[in-house]
Amino acid sequence: LTLAEACRGFPIEVRRQAEITSLGFVEVPLDGRLVFALSEGLLQRGRAVGGVSAVLTRGHLAHHVGQEFGLAIADDPRRMFVEVHNRLVKEGYYGPLQASSIDATARVRPGAIVSPTGITIGPHCEIAPGAILEPETVLAADVRILPGAVLGSDGFQTMRFDDAMIDIHHAGSLEVGARTVVMANAVLARAVFRQATRIGSDCRIGNGAFVSHNVQIGDRTLIGHGAVIAGNCTIGSDVTIGPGAICLDRLEIADRAYVTAGSVVTRCVGAGERVTGNFAIPHDLHVDFVKKIASRSS
């Protein structure tokens, strides 16, 4: 796809042509991608991450875009980026969906809703009544999906403009590892661009939990009931995210970390670290703080 083909019909001036294979944010490590940039800092970040093929930006930033990149100019690059992406999704640019494949040993119970296209269900999986599987969802062997769970939906990726709020259509996939259990009413979102949201093997996703777009979760990790994992987080293996905890976007929670129930995580958490509170701090510090408050009030 050429940059001009992607931008056709929109108020965008293509000044330098390029071939693109995907759209993506500057932080997303995808080769051949079109990015938007509203500042010189974002342009530098895109160059540092690599894989950029073309840049959609404002006219006054054009001279900061190297000759090796395609260049498109718009008054509102951010909005045009979203509009271009959403149209390409609707036109099937990110790939035609294949007929769904369900292993003969899998059990899809009556009342489950499985898209006729874009689904792969592995051996011995169990899909309960009321579960919903949207396109581009891949289940490895022995996965269990309990009633009311929704897999492969759009995550919460919305951009606000002066006159509108526009959702970014999700064009990636969701992959769930072997023997993982997704409990009742949990929601697992697919990725936004040509990437995957990945849940490892032997994980447990609790009742009513929400795992947003582009999240990566390692093996044997437990996401507690009602927990929220915001977009682009990386959660390691053998991690526990307690019930009702919230992990804000783009954080890394390393292997064996423990986030206690109801905590709000605003920073990365190291391997084996235990954090508590709103906002979450090392657990021992939180306990000391509570003891000090209690001693003052007694």
State where each predicted segment sits.
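Terminal amphipathic alpha-helical/low-complexity segments used for targeting or macromolecular assembly
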Residues: 1-105, 142, 148-149, 153-167, ...
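Structural signal for interior beta-strand "rungs" in well-ordered beta-sheet cores
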Residues: 36, 97, 101-282
